[in-house]
Regions:
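Catalytic His-Asp charge-relay segment
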Residues: 264-265
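Short, surface-exposed "cap/lid" segments of acyl-processing enzymes
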Residues: 56, 62-115, 134
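Short, hydrophobic alpha-helix immediately C-terminal to the catalytic nucleophile
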Residues: 88, 92, 129, 157-161
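Catalytic nucleophile-loop/oxyanion-hole region of alpha/beta-hydrolase
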Residues: 93, 107-145
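Active-site nucleophile elbow and catalytic-triad environment of alpha/beta-hydrolase enzymes
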Residues: 238-259
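N-terminal cap/lid segment of alpha/beta-hydrolase-fold proteins
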Residues: 26-67
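N-terminal presequences and immediately downstream first alpha-helices
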Residues: 1-33
Length: 265
């Protein structure tokens, strides 16, 4: 990596992490990203992957006509999707550098609510591993790269733990700001600026309503989107999926307390 990147320090006016988060989702940023991602998006094909047990996950595959330098799979964060600014920006940079890029949507992210009856939750690791195995087999990929942001970073590292037994030939994993301890992340969100909890609560409500529209026979009478507070809503939905409550659910996808010790990628 060039030294100018290793030693980079943002201008004083842009050092606030909160400001960087806001600017990252701004309209100005969006226009710049879309301009850079034209080639990536023009090359993109919609692929539906086998997640096992009838589960389907969808993503976008951008391949170089003359053969690329290798495959990189990108995983987005919670309530993001394959067209989030950071996914397009990273994908465009990788594609421009000669890599084939696959951007995977998690269940119920993007416009995929109709693909599976069950709701997304962060402990659904098996379907992501199965889908990536399907992708690897279909492409004949070897020593491919996996990168994820936030919750996607958490998934990437957990996929790495399963890589050996699943036969995934992952050469490198990059996790950007991964969720390490979900319980502590929730504590921080509740004690920090209320904007973040409001932002995710609003996006999650929209997603849950979309799910109910796709499967009215299953969720038409549910009022989960009306439960205020991320912890309360998480607790309610966790109990619907076999967990004692939010804390047990958080522990189910935590990678804290030595759980990455056996990561060999």
């Amino acid at each position: 990596m060039p030294e100018k990147y290793i030693n980079f320090t943002p201008p004083l006016s842009l050092r606030s992490g909160h400001l960087q988060s806001l600017l990252g989702s701004s309209g100005l940023r969006r226009r710049a990203v879309l301009k850079r991602a034209v080639a990536l998006q023009e090359a993109a094909e919609v692929w539906t992957l086998d997640g096992g047990d009838g589960i389907r996950l969808q993503g976008y595959y951008s391949k170089h006509a003359e053969g690329g330098r290798g495959l990189v799979v990108l995983l987005h964060g919670w309530e993001g999707n394959v067209n989030s600014n950071y996914m397009l920006g990273t994908g465009a940079r990788l594609y421009g550098a000669g890599f084939d890029v696959f951007r995977l949507n998690f269940r119920d992210h993007g416009d995929t609510h109709h693909l599976n009856p069950g709701l997304f939750h962060s402990c659904r690791l098996g379907e992501v591993v199965h889908a990536l195995s399907d992708l690897q087999d279909r492409l004949g990929a070897s020593r491919w790269g996996l990168a994820g942001y936030s919750l996607g970073g958490n998934f990437s590292l957990r996929v790495g733990l399963k890589a050996g037994e699943a036969g995934l030939d992952i050469g490198r994993i990059v996790a950007i700001c991964p969720v390490i301890d979900p319980a502590k992340a929730m504590d921080s969100m509740e004690s920090g600026l209320k904007f973040y909890e409001w932002y995710f609560e609003r996006k999650w409500s929209r997603s849950l309503r979309a799910k109910a529209i796709c499967f009215p026979e299953l969720y038409g009478q549910e009022t989960w989107h009306e439960i205020r507070g991320l912890r309360a809503r998480t607790h309610y939905l966790a109990t619907k999926h076999g967990y004692a409550g939010a804390e047990e659910y958080f522990d189910g996808y935590s990678i804290a307390r030595g759980r990455l010790e056996n990561l060999s990628v």
